[in-house]
């Protein structure tokens, strides 16, 4: 068969079927273009996560902010401060001035190098000096040894540009609060949706609006579901406790508060037992404080004592359990469900975020009238809190905070009950 014959045969074939061939080529090109743009979305890991709470772009949950960026410092599992954006720091004057040197090899997620001019924590009680592109100085009004802990909060440039692997793709706000936030990393996309209550969050999951619930305390709605996985973790950075109004005439006596603590059976409470104000993971934690295990011999003087126990709605079951324990020893207890701490309360049941540093000046010092919920005024505890926040040596600070916990628990401005259980629920 001659080459000329083969050429004419091919020419005749194309002439007869050219329309079909061109359509096939066109469809093939469209197919490969579609694969290029669509396949990543098919194969990528996409999650839609629901979270309860009101958050702003400046105050996001750690679950999100730590994916997007980091601070000058960060905190390890033991609660110790370690370098992050800053590679080193020092205080030349015992905690009033802090100088940080940033890592010159780090970049923002937009590819630009990080300089000290980009760092803006917007502190109202500190001035900032930019020494050079790699050195920044903070001038405080008074010495504060825990200042590097404050700088563990992730920082961002304008547009929520951070230093993490994830980037913000879209953000939706309502009245300044986050409604929806989409972040991406290579082929992964995570959509966060925010809800005002656990009930709204659970409904969204049931309706398929989200495929993962982040940290709720009551997963019972889904215990019988075969299509979900439920993961439990202990919230060691929180405690549930009863705060006593130490200015109330019925509760101003330390002995009464101690006896009320002894009246509660703590072994059958949810979560993991808490005995003090610090996380057991903290380097300053004191495991040797008085535990106030139930002791009915200490409760004889409580008969006919009247107490109103105010509680947030999510802790109502715990409040009812405490009411039962108290009534068993003759206490007349009434439960009041509230959305916030009442101005003139007697006992208030709440979940508290434990500060990342052992410094709890704002929670217990007598001068902190807006945050000292129990209205505690104890000179010895005040002095320990004052000493702890100006001492730079960690071992010396630890001794101070061991004493602080011992005296605070003895004073019983609050009964420390448990570290709560949190549940994350996701579809299989």
Predicted feature locations:
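Hydrophobic membrane-insertion alpha-helices, especially the h-region
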Residues: 18-36
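Ligand/substrate-recognition segments at binding pockets and active sites
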Residues: 23-24, 299-354
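N-terminal lobe/hinge region of extracytoplasmic solute-binding protein
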Residues: 47-93
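Gly/Pro-rich hinge or "lid" segments in bacterial periplasmic/extracellular proteins
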Residues: 76, 133, 139-192, 196-199
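Aromatic- and charge-enriched surface segment that lines or borders ligand/interaction sites
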Residues: 88-127, 204
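Extracellular/periplasmic solute-recognition and catalytic clefts
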Residues: 171-179, 191-247, 351-352
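A bilobed periplasmic-binding-protein/Venus flytrap-type ligand-binding module shared by bacterial periplasmic
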Residues: 182, 194, 227-259, 263, ...
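Detector for C-terminal structural segments
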Residues: 259-288, 317-321, 343-428
């Amino acid at each position: 068969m001659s080459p000329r014959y083969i050429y004419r045969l091919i020419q005749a074939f194309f002439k007869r079927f050219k329309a079909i061939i061109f359509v096939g080529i066109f469809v093939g090109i469209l197919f490969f273009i579609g694969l290029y743009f669509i396949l990543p979305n098919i194969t990528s890991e996409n999650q839609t996560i629901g979270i309860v709470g009101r958050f702003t772009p400046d105050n996001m949950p750690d679950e999100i902010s730590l994916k997007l960026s980091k601070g000058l410092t960060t905190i390890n599992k033991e609660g110790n401060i370690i370098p992050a954006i800053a590679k080193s720091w020092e205080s030349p004057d015992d905690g009033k001035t802090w100088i940080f040197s940033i890592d010159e090899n780090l970049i923002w997620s937009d590819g630009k190098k990080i300089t000290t001019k980009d760092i803006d924590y917007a502190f109202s009680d500190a001035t900032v000096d930019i020494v050079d592109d790699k050195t920044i100085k903070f001038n405080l009004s008074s010495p504060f040894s825990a200042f590097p802990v404050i700088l563990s909060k992730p920082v961002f440039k304008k547009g929520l540009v951070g230093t993490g692997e994830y980037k913000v793709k879209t953000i939706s706000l309502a009245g300044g609060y986050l409604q929806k936030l989409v972040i991406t990393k290579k082929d992964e996309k995570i959509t966060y949706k925010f809800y005002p209550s656990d009930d709204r969050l659970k409904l969204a999951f049931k309706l398929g609006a989200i495929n993962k619930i982040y940290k709720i305390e009551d997963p019972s709605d889904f215990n019988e579901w075969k299509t979900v996985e439920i993961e439990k973790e202990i919230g060691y950075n929180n405690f549930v406790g009863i705060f006593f109004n130490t200015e109330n005439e019925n509760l101003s006596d330390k002995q009464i508060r101690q006896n009320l603590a002894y009246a509660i059976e703590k072994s059958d409470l949810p979560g993991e037992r808490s005995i003090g104000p610090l996380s057991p993971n903290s380097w300053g934690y004191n495991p040797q404080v008085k535990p106030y295990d139930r002791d009915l011999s200490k409760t004889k003087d409580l008969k006919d004592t009247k107490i109103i126990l105010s509680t947030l709605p999510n802790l109502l079951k715990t409040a009812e359990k405490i009411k039962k324990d108290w009534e068993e020893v003759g206490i007349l207890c009434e439960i009041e469900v509230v959305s916030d701490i009442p101005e003139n309360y007697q006992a208030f049941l709440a979940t508290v975020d434990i500060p990342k540093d052992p410094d709890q000046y704002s929670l217990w010092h007598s001068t902190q009238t807006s945050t000292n919920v129990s209205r505690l005024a104890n000179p010895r505890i005040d002095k320990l809190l004052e000493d702890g926040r100006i001492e730079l040596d960690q071992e010396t600070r630890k001794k101070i905070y061991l004493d602080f916990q011992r005296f605070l628990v003895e004073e019983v401005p609050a009964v420390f009950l448990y570290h709560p259980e949190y549940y994350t629920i996701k579809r299989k």
